[in-house]
Amino acid sequence: MTTLINRPNTALVVIDVQNGVVGEAYNRDNVVANIASLIDKARAADVDVVWVQDSGAGARDSEGWQLVSELSRREGEPLVQKDFADSFEETDLESILAERSVGQLVVAGAQTDECIRSTLHGAIARGYDATLVADAHTTEDLSEWGAPTPDLVIAHTNLYWSNHAAPGRTAGTVNSADVDFTIAPGV
């Protein structure tokens, strides 16, 4: 249960699903399709969809900076512009969530080992419950620089987040097919 008072609502947070971020990402098409399914489920359940866009993914308004063509933000859905891996750092994400009485986050997007991890930890540290959708996040292959392969990065993140906890807050993972936004609070 979130430690945030009077914040019973859930939001789907879609992080950095931009051409320049996921263009070469592992399992890109399946992950984007799973995110599209989550967006449809959230909208059908009248759950807020909050978009996060990395301003470092290329020049603003460039092709690389744009959200992928398979996903479309609706008018009125918040768009958070960020410069740091944690989507809360120096952005209006917290105020957007507070306005909507959100205390539970369902997180999807990219990059697993950067912005996904940082935002999940930032959410828990700020009092949110945070659920990672296990098959709806991805990363690029950085193994030539000594990183594990993307499938291992994703699997490791899913493993440790499925067991993460903090006083008064919940964390966990769920597959996109099992997300049910009609069950309060969260999935």
Where are these regions (language model features)?
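Short acidic, Gly/Ser-rich segments with clustered Asp/Glu that frequently serve as metal-coordination loops
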Residues: 18-23
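N-terminal nucleotide-binding beta1-loop-alpha1 segment
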Residues: 13-17
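Conserved GNAT-fold acetyl-CoA-binding loop/helix
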Residues: 26-27
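Active-site-adjacent betaalpha module
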Residues: 2-11, 33, 37-40, 44-45, ...
